[in-house]
Regions:
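A short, Lys/Arg-rich alpha-helix, primarily the initiator
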Residues: 1-28
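Short, positively charged
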Residues: 11, 88-104, 197
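Residue-level signal for the short linker/turn that defines the boundary of a DNA-recognition helix
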Residues: 20, 30-31, 57-60
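Short alpha-helical DNA-recognition segment
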Residues: 28-49
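Hydrophobic protein-protein interaction segments
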Residues: 101-253
Length: 263
């Protein structure tokens, strides 16, 4: 699946994904609008308008609904940014054709697995040598979603494959509308839907961490085969501004994990 051509800029109204997520979250919790109203302190009529996408929710209303529905921090931040998209946001950028040399020098100076990625399309735009060793095949020719679902090596590398892929697929479903062009979403959906787990991952909510302070994943060491517990960190550049994020995997700071990762 090629993803380097310029995308059609037909992006969904950013308020509709907010409406859809809140409605699905309420229904999954088994709450009526009246019951949610009692918990959130918002009238049922306003909840209905927000869920229909006919009323843009204020930050106060969103916060009240998030608290009442126990929305994970990962999705809270994204939905708040979507609510401001018509004033401050912009659609997902095209894949850059050239990465500045300074960015590549920084990337290659990191001894642990690191890559530059575009969110929320999971495009990989550059990798270092450690990334290539730990995640074979996950390079600029594919996306993280396609690699996880379609490349058999991902199931060997990711020791918590089901949990992590479920979270990524559901995150793509929630966070791409309103940001990523619909044509691009449809193409990624079609490419990944051949995986037998796709429907379950797409239609059911995963066990999302309540906080994001220590996202730990177990990765198989490429040489020894040992399980290495690593924290994934996503770094956004403020100066200079960049359209991509620096994604790194670092071993936990206990001696056994550090020694295994450094072998």
């Amino acid at each position: 699946l090629s993803h380097r051509t310029k995308e059609d800029r037909d992006v969904e109204d950013p308020h509709l994904p907010i409406a859809r997520y809140l409605r699905e979250r309420r229904e999954a919790a088994g709450l009526t609008r009246v019951a949610l109203s009692a918990q959130a302190g918002i009238s049922p009529a306003l909840i209905q308008k927000i869920e229909q996408g006919s009323r843009t929710p204020t930050l106060e209303a969103l916060t009240a609904l998030f608290d009442a529905l126990d929305v994970p921090a990962l999705f809270r931040d994204h939905l708040v940014s979507l609510s401001l998209a018509d004033r401050y946001g912009s659609p997902a950028a095209d894949i850059p054709s050239d990465i500045p040399t300074a960015d590549l020098v920084l990337l290659n100076s990191i001894s642990y697995p690191a890559s530059l990625q575009m969110y929320t399309t999971y495009d990989v735009v550059a990798t270092n040598s450690a990334w290539t060793r730990y995640f074979p095949g996950l390079d600029t020719s594919t996306t993280l979603l396609e690699w996880m679902l379609l490349d058999p090596r991902s199931r060997e590398v990711m020791l918590d494959w089901d949990k992590q892929v479920h979270l990524c697929v559901y995150g793509f479903r929630v966070m791409s509308p309103g940001v990523v062009p619909k044509e691009r979403i449809d193409r990624l959906f079609a490419a990944c839907a051949v995986a037998e787990e796709w429907e379950r991952f797409w239609t059911t909510e995963p066990d999302v961490p309540s906080h994001l302070d220590r996202p730990v994943q177990r990765i198989r060491h490429p040489e020894t085969g040992a399980a290495v517990a690593m924290t994934m960190q996503v770094h956004d550049s403020i100066v200079p501004r960049r359209e991509w994020s620096l994604v790194t995997f670092c071993p936990l700071l206990d001696g056994s994990s550090r020694d295994a990762a450094n072998q």
